[in-house]
Amino acid sequence: MVIRVDPERNEIRALKEVRTWRDKKVLEVGCGAGRLTLRLATLHPKSIHAIDPGADLIRTARKNLPTQFAKQIRYRVGSAEELKYPSNSFDITVFSWVL
């Protein structure tokens, strides 16, 4: 028997149950190539600032960014240790699959 699990689908389902995302400012730390970022965008936050230390991953995320989310999502190379945002800039912070 083979059971396939989509961890990102389960993750987004759990995140939807936790709180309202509409019109919230979101920081995603460890966004990788942006797969979860794009799913978060469907929850209608005001903005998503997605960071990852991998420059290649950020390039991929920017390349794959659909035009419908271009004004909503901002990708940046960076790490959790060196966040360059003022305090209280975000309503929600997401750390997913970050070690």
Residue spans of the language-model regions?
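Short, flexible helix/strand-to-coil boundary loops that buttress conserved ligand/catalytic motifs
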Residues: 19, 62, 87-89
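Conserved alpha-helix/loop element of class I SAM-dependent methyltransferases that forms part
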Residues: 5-24
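A short acidic, Gly/Pro-enriched loop at the edge of an enzyme's catalytic core
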Residues: 81-92
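A short SAM/SAH-binding and catalytic strip from SAM-dependent methyltransferases
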Residues: 91-99
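Conserved glycine-rich SAM-binding loop
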Residues: 32
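Active-site acidic short loop of glycosyltransferases
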Residues: 23, 70, 87-88
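Non-catalytic interaction surface on structured domains
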Residues: 1-6, 35
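Class I SAM-dependent methyltransferase SAM/SAH-binding core
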Residues: 27, 35-82
